[in-house]
C-alpha cells in the first residue's frame, strides 16, 4: 500500500508515509 499510496498521493506521499508509519 505504501507504493500505491505514494503514487496516488504523489507530492503528499511523504506526509501520508509518516501518517501510515505512525
From Swiss-Prot:
In its UniProt record, a GO molecular function of this protein is:
serine-type endopeptidase inhibitor activity
| Top-level lineage group | Eukaryota
Residues annotated as signal peptide:
none
Function recorded in the entry: Inhibitor of chymotrypsin.
Family that this chain belongs to: Belongs to the protease inhibitor I13 (potato type I serine protease inhibitor) family.
The record's subunit annotation is: Heterodimer of an A chain and a B chain, linked by a disulfide bond.
Protein's name in the database = Cytin chain B
- Organism (species): Theromyzon tessulatum
